[in-house]
């Protein structure tokens, strides 16, 4: 009679007749609702077993069910891949499952669809790969601790679309984290790691292990779409080194929200080396805190987005830089938040919005690339009560050499300059400070009760445009310097000031127009609000070139529909106008029913006759 031999082969392991050899054996545990740390349960599957599978063995859960573990276990490799299971360690003593396979082959642990409740998973200092590719989702909860990991990877080797949730006061301890550790030859990504419910991720690696990634080894910028979502009170992620959100990849998101916090030595939002692409990576902080401790925040690639709402961002104790110098067309939106940092370096195409009366935006940079940097296409908006008051000590020269940039101050926001030595408001120049430093085709908008003020304000440069739409531009200072210059210095040319809406306001000691400037009023449909006067200057009006050849006064009444004969005050001065100045105002080209008049030698008014009302007859 031949002796029956039972052979199981896995990873080169051989089990003969149910007894262990020196090689690893593979054991499938298929007992529904079973305890895979119970020898008697194993014997129902493998009757000849005399001890539990151990550090030379591969344990594989082979059924869609709930499993428990009633004592600590150490195995070579562990898997519930391709099954939907619940590992209910919490109800069976919160014991430790130690997985010891080295950093070769499959790296010890496989998980696809399932829930792990409580207990400890100890990776013995090795890498831990979860293989959460498309359609697979695992939840770790109820205080489960995943510990002693070298590299922790949610997805690897070109897999995409998986989700891993770390919830319920759980813990992850590793040297480094990879949401997606892809392949240079395969497009991959769209991986989610959610950390919530008071859970904590602690990454403690040094050297090469000090770098954690949303996406590494991706295919030349084509991979991406990974999300690290940290949210909820008490939820934290602490990185001893650097976190890179978007390494050679695109559209990756780091979100910190709802009382959660993220700390790292440094943070990169987008990163690339020569020849590699990265774009559209995002940092979203919504009611959360992001801090760096020892290094800066750096953004790279086109279209980076920073979105902060009720947030705190602190860069290296408030002294570190935020560097966007390699991030063209970045969008930064800061609302009701605290930003504590040092230098703020920008790149062309910046779109920066700072909003909220309680927002603190502490940076050493004062110009956001719109000083004498030659920047093209930057846009800055101060909004919703935010007050920006840079302290410079030599005046604020904005848009000196920039082109097609814009500054918008609106909805109760304030832009002003401060001289710390004199403890006074300082001068603000828009558009250049010399014939060799000229800003061109820039726009300054003051809207919806927004406010710009300084000791002296000047619009200069070439073809720059100041638009006051129900906003206020005013000067505060000594009579000798309290003035607004609309076209300052003989190298200015083609600038324009437009007053729009029912309550546009210029308030200055003196108003000066010159060097090819257009002063334009756009009268709204119903005219100005009661008692509203767009320009008031108690110290008078002055035209730099008295022959008026270069300057233009315009009044656009195309929207104005007076219901009766109407008089609107456009400007009121505290000193008499000269005959040349009167002629300049009266020279505006207007339709027949409108004309400019000078009242008491000091007030410029627009008079309008109501259009004759005819009878309309309809014959059917």
Q: What residue spans do the PLM features occupy?
A:
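Sec-dependent, cleavable N-terminal signal peptides
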Residues: 1-26
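Solvent-exposed adhesion/ligand-recognition segments of exported proteins
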Residues: 21-95, 556-620
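Cysteine-rich, disulfide-stabilized extracellular repeat modules
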Residues: 32, 38, 55, 112, ...
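Feature marks extracellular polysaccharide-active and adherence modules
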Residues: 62, 70, 76, 81, ...
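Extracellular beta-strand/beta-solenoid scaffold signature
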Residues: 74, 101-108, 123-132, 148-161, ...
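Asparagine/serine/threonine-enriched low-complexity, disordered tracts
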Residues: 106, 133, 155, 180, ...
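Extracellular beta-strand/loop-rich repeat segments of large surface/secreted proteins
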Residues: 456, 465-567, 575
């Amino acid at each position: 009679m031949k002796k029956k031999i039972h052979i199981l082969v896995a990873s080169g392991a051989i089990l003969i007749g149910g007894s262990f050899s020196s090689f690893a054996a593979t054991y499938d545990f298929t007992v529904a609702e079973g305890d895979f740390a119970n020898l008697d349960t194993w014997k129902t599957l493998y009757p000849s077993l005399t001890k539990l599978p151990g550090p030379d063995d591969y344990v594989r859960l082979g059924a869609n069910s709930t499993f428990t573990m009633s004592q600590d276990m150490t195995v070579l490799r562990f898997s519930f891949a391709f099954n939907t299971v619940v590992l209910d360690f919490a109800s069976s003593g919160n014991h430790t499952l130690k997985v010891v396979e080295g950093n070769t082959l499959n790296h010890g642990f496989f998980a696809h669809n399932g829930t792990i409740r409580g207990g400890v998973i100890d990776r013995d200092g090795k890498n831990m790969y979860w293989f959460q590719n498309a359609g697979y989702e695992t939840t770790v909860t109820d205080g489960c601790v995943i510990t002693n990991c070298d590299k922790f990877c949610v997805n690897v080797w070109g897999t995409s679309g998986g989700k891993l949730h770390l919830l319920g006061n759980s813990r992850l301890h590793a040297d480094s984290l990879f949401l997606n550790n892809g392949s240079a030859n395969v497009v991959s990504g769209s991986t989610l790691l959610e950390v919530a419910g008071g859970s904590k991720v602690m990454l403690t690696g040094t050297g090469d292990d000090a770098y954690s990634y949303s996406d590494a080894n991706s295919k030349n910028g084509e991979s991406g779409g990974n999300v690290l979502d940290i949210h909820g009170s008490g939820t934290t992620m602490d990185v001893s080194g650097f976190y890179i959100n978007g390494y050679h990849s695109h559209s990756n998101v780091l979100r910190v929200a709802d009382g959660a916090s993220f700390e790292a030595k440094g943070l990169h939002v987008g990163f690339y080396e020569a020849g590699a692409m990265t774009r559209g990576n995002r940092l979203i902080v919504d009611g959360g805190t992001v801090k760096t401790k020892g290094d800066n925040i750096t953004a790279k690639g086109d279209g980076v987005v920073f979105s902060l709402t009720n947030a705190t961002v602190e860069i290296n104790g408030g002294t570190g830089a935020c560097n966007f110098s390699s991030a063209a067309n970045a969008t930064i939106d800061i609302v009701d938040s605290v930003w504590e940092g040092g230098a703020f370096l920008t790149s062309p195409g910046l779109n920066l919005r700072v909003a909220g009366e309680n927002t603190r935006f502490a940076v050493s940079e004062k110009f956001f690339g719109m000083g004498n940097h030659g920047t093209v296409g930057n846009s800055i908006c101060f909004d919703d009560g935010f007050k920006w008051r840079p302290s410079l000590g030599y005046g604020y020269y904005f848009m000196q050499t920039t082109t097609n940039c814009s500054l918008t101050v609106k909805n109760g926001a304030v832009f002003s300059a401060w001289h710390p030595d004199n403890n006074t408001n300082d001068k603000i120049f828009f558009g250049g400070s010399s014939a060799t430093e000229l800003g061109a085709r820039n726009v300054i908008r003051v809207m919806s009760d927004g406010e710009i003020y300084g000791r002296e304000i000047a619009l200069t440069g070439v073809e720059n445009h100041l638009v006051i739409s129900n906003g206020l531009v005013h000067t505060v200072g000594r009579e000798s310097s309290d003035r607004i210059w609309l076209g300052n210095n003989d190298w200015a040319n083609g600038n324009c000031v437009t007053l729009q809406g029912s309550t546009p306001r210029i308030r200055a000691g003196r108003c000066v127009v010159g060097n090819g400037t257009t002063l334009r009023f756009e009268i709204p449909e119903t005219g100005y609000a009661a008692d509203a006067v767009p320009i008031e200057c108690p110290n008078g009006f002055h035209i730099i070139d008295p022959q008026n050849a270069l300057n233009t006064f315009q009044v656009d009444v195309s929207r104005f529909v007076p219901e009766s004969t109407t008089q609107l005050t456009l400007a009121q001065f505290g000193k008499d106008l000269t005959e040349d100045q009167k002629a300049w105002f009266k020279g505006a080209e207007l339709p027949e029913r409108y004309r400019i008049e000078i009242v008491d030698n000091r007030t410029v008014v627009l008079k309008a006759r109501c259009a004759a009302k005819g009878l309309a007859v309809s014959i059917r």
